[in-house]
Amino acid sequence: MQELATTGMTIYQPMTGTTNDNVDGMLEKANRSESLGRHGGDIKGITDNLDYLADLGVTALWINPLLENNMPKQSYHGYAITDLYEIDPRFGTLEDYINLSSKMSEQGIKLIMDQVANHCGSDHWWMKDLPFEDWVNYQARFEAGEKPVFSNHKRTTNQDIYAAKIDAKEMTEGWFVDTMPDLNQDNPFMATYLIQNSIWWIETVQLGGIRQDTYPYPDKIFMSNWAGAIMKEYPNFSIVGEEWSYNPLLVGYWQDGAQNKDGYDSNLRSTMDFPMQKNIVEALKEEEKWNKGFVKIYEGLANDFHYPSPKDIMIFPDNHDMDRIHTQLNEDPVLTKMAMAYLLTLPRIPQLYYGTEILMENTTKPGDHGLIRTDFPGGWEGDQVNAFTEEGLNVEQKEMQHYLKTLLQFRKKSKAIHEGKTIHFSPKNGVYLMFRVLNEEVVVLILNKNADPVELNLSRFKEMTLEDRKLTSLFDGETIIWKDSITLSKRGALILTTNE
C-alpha cells in the first residue's frame, strides 16, 4: 500500500540539476548562460546526492514536473507538459525515475510527484489531432487559430455565493497563457484519463505523494472525484494542493473535512499555507507594535480553528515562484534562522526550497525567476563552490547549513513536534513563546527581537508546569533550570527541550 506518513515529514524542493545534457529531437537545448533556460540537470544528479539530503534531515522530495516538456522556451520549469506518460529524456528515463524512488526509500525519503490536471503544453502530441470537440476548453477558437479566452484568475468564484456564472466560467475554463491549453475535465474521457494517469504513476514509481499544481483552476467537482479516486485506492496516501491565496478561509475550503456552506468536500488531505508564509515574513521584518511584528504569527496561528486538520497543511518559507526567504528577510541570517526555527516547530508539514540551507538569495533582482532558480553550487564540473562538501562556502553559509541540519535532525526525532499539542503566548516586549508538548516531552521555542540582553520572567508561563525542570538548548547544549527567569542574551531563536 502506498502511503505518505505526514507525521514528522520534512519536504525538500530541488530543481533538477547536475549534468549538462542535450537530446536530439528536443526543441530547447541546455544553456547555463540563459537564466530561464535549461541548465541540464537530471534525475541521476538527484540520485547521486541522496546522502546529502538524508544527512541534512530531509524525509521527502517534491521535484518540479519531470514529464516530457518539449516546448521551445523555459521547458525546464515543467508545467507545460507535452506527454503525461513520458519522462523528459533530458532528465532521464522511466527506469531512472523508478530507481530514484527506490534509492530514496532506502534512505527513508518519500518521493512526491508534481502533477498538473489543469492544463498541458501547446506542443502536446494530442493538440495536433484532438480526439473530441471538447477535449480542451475554447477548443473551437484554438482550431480556428484565434486567441483563447484567458482565465480571469478570480479563484474566489469557487466559494463566492454571489459569483456571476460568467466569472466562474472564465476562471475555470480560461487558459493560463496561450501555450497552456486548458483541459476540459467535464469530458468524461479526459476525466478518466487524468485519474488513471495519476494512479499509474503512483503504482509504477511507488510514489509517496502528489503535489497538485493550481488546484482551484480545474473543475472543482472533478478535482474532488480525482482525489477521491486516489484515496479510495490508497487510503493512507497524501495529496497537497496549491491554492495561492493569503486568505486562510480560501485555503481551508480545499481541505478534506471542511464544513463548507456549499457542501463541497475536496477529498484533499493537505493544502499550502500561503497565509502563514506571509505572516512569518511580516512578523520578523516589522517593528513590534500592537498590530505589527510577532502578533502576525500569533494571530495567524489562531486561524487554525478554521482548518479541519492543521497538522496536515504544508508550510514553507519560499518556493520556486517567489523570492527566496533570505531575500525576503533582507539577507539577515538571524532572521532567516528565526524563520526556520518557527517553521520547523509548527504543527505543520514543512517544505524547504533547495539552497535555503546555504542562504541562497536573489536580492540583486527581486522577482527574477531565473535568479530564484539559480543552480545549486557543486552540481556542475568546474563549480568553485560545492555545497555538498562545504567547499567554498563562507562562514555564514556553513553556520546556516549546520543550524538547519541540527534543527531537521531534531525534528525527525521529536514526538512532541510531530504529535504534541501546541500552546503559544501572546508576544510581549519583542519576545514570543510557543510550546509543543507530548507527555513528558516539552519543546520550547523562544523568538527574541531585542538586540540587548533581556530578562524573561517565567511566572507568566506557569500553566506549562515546567518549574524546576531541566531543559537543554538545542544549538549549544547548555542546560537551564526552569524557575524564575532566564536571560535572553541576544536577538534570535532559542529552542529548549526536556529531552537530553
Language-model region placement:
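N-terminal structural segment of carbohydrate-active enzymes
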Residues: M1-K110, W125, V177
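Active-site-proximal helices and loops of the catalytic beta/alpha 8
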Residues: S101-S102, H119, H124-K128, N197-I199, ...
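Loop/turn elements at helix/coil->beta-strand transitions in domains of secreted/extracellular proteins
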Residues: A54-L61, S105-I112, Q206-G209, Y234-S238, ...
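Active-site-adjacent "subsite" loops/lids of carbohydrate-active enzymes
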Residues: E133-A140, A163-V205, R211, Y215
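The substrate-binding groove and active-site-proximal loops of carbohydrate-active enzymes
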Residues: E28-K44, A80-T93, V177-A191, G208-Y217, ...
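Conserved, mostly hydrophobic/aromatic
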Residues: L53, I63, L84, M104, ...
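Carbohydrate-interacting/catalytic domains
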Residues: M1-Q2, T6, Y12-M15, H39-T59, ...
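Aromatic- and acidic-residue-enriched segments that line the glycan-binding/catalytic groove
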Residues: Q13-G17, M71-D83, A117-D167, Y253-G263, ...
